[in-house]
C-alpha cells in the first residue's frame, strides 16, 4: 500500500536495533516496491550521519538479509532515494546538467565505487559541495577553494568548513 500511494520509508537500523533489538522488515518493503531511504534517527540512539547509518544497514543486509540489497541500492538509499522522496529530483540528487552540484568526494580504497561509499569513514571525505560551492573537506582543498575556512579537529584528522556560506535565500 505504501508503494502504491507513492510513499517512502525512512530506515534507521542503528536506532531500531539499539532501542528494540530488531528493525523493520526492510526486505518486504523492497519487495513491495517502496522507496527506501537510510538515515540516522536521533542523537541518543542513532548514528551521527547517513554515512555511519549506512554501515549498520550494510551489516544487516549482509548478515541477516543475505544480500537482499546491492551496494548500489544501499547507496541510492542515502542519496537519490531521499531526493526523490522529498520531490527535489528536478533540482539535485544526480550529476546532470542543470541540477545543483551537491557532491561528496571520497578517497578511493575500494575498486567498486558503491562499496567505497559504504566503507568510507569521516577522514575519507575529501570535499563536500552544495550547489557547486565547497562547504566541507580537507584543509588543503578548502584553503584553496575558500577564504579562511574554520578548521575542525576529529580524532586523528582535521577538516575545514566554510561557515560563512549562506545557501538559503528567503
Predicted features along the sequence, with ranges:
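Active-site microenvironment of metallo-dependent hydrolases
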Residues: 76-168
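Active-site-adjacent C-terminal substructures of enzyme catalytic domains
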Residues: 1-95, 104-110
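Hydrophobic aliphatic residue packing
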Residues: 34-36, 128, 170
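Accessible peptide chain termini
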Residues: 1, 168-170
Amino acid at each position: 500500500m505504501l508503494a502504491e500511494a507513492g510513499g517512502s520509508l525512512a530506515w534507521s537500523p542503528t536506532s531500531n536495533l539499539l532501542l528494540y533489538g530488531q528493525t523493520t522488515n526492510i526486505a518486504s518493503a523492497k519487495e513491495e516496491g517502496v522507496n527506501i531511504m537510510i538515515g540516522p534517527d536521533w542523537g541518543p540512539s542513532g548514528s551521527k550521519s547517513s554515512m555511519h547509518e549506512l554501515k549498520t544497514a550494510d551489516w544487516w543486509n549482509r548478515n541477516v538479509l543475505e544480500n537482499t540489497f546491492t551496494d548500489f541500492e544501499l547507496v541510492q538509499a542515502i542519496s537519490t532515494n531521499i531526493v526523490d522522496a522529498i520531490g527535489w529530483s528536478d533540482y539535485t540528487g544526480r550529476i546532470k546538467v542543470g541540477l545543483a552540484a551537491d557532491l561528496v568526494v571520497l578517497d578511493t580504497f575500494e575498486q567498486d565505487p558503491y562499496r567505497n561509499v559504504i566503507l568510507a569513514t569521516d577522514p575519507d571525505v575529501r570535499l563536500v559541495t552544495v550547489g557547486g560551492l565547497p562547504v566541507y573537506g580537507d584543509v588543503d582543498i578548502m584553503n584553496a577553494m575558500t577564504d579562511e575556512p574554520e578548521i575542525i579537529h576529529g580524532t586523528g584528522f582535521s577538516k575545514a568548513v566554510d561557515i560563512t556560506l549562506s545557501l538559503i535565500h528567503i
